[in-house]
Amino acid sequence: MFVRFVQLKVSTEYLKTLQGFYEKIVIPELQKISGCQYACLIQNGNSADEFVSMTFWDTKKEAEDYEKSGVYQSLINQTKPFLAESSEWKIKLSDDFELKYEPVTEEPVLKEYSVAAQSGDKPSDEQNPRMYVRIVSAKVKEGKMDDFKKLYADVVIPTLKNTKGCQYVYLTESMQEENQIISLTIWDSKEDAEQYEKSGRFAELTDKVKHTLSELFQWKMALEKETGKKAKTSEDLEVSRYSVVTGKSFH
């Protein structure tokens, strides 16, 4: 299985409009595409203007064929009126040699992942309006990817599947960044995901796999233990939380 994320930063005036566009335009188009199993629009819990279009595919080739077909670019072009303006400005010289300043639109960012382990099938077509997505991004130590995957399959997945409200679990490996993985979990509700974090289970699982994570992350953990103070590095575990706005299963 293959997962694609298209990250969008949307202008505040179009936050509600995007849902209708996704339901009426994006989902019907994706439903026609061979290999697309599931599509959903999720909204960042910390930044209401940040959305992700998350799609699941049978194979990498079918996802690539979709991108090459022109449909993907057409959908991206149709979203452009909704996108927020960047803090950057474009400077260009006009025909009469005057400098012009134009705002730059926040372009969509595509990220692709191959599913390395999973708890079961793709999300079902029964859309729970309270569904919640939790994404943990981590950097794995060089040469430790196989060990990490085994621990994830043998320890992490069973623990999460026995946790109240956790419906689906996926370990995915980045196709663009070496040794970069994300743990993707889909929950019945935000409350269930938060209770999992508060229970200490997330910290326990992190402790069980930490020896397979990057050397920089391990150094940070050792430093925190020694000093009793929090440290921050470029290879920390990054936890992102999203509410499901809308979605549909196609098979």
List the predicted regions and their residue ranges.
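Short S/T/G/P-rich N-terminal loop/turn motif that feeds into the first structured element of a domain
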Residues: M1-F51, D58-K68, P81-I182, I186-E204, ...
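Short helix C-cap/helix-to-loop transition motifs enriched in small/turn-promoting residues
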Residues: Y72-L75, E85
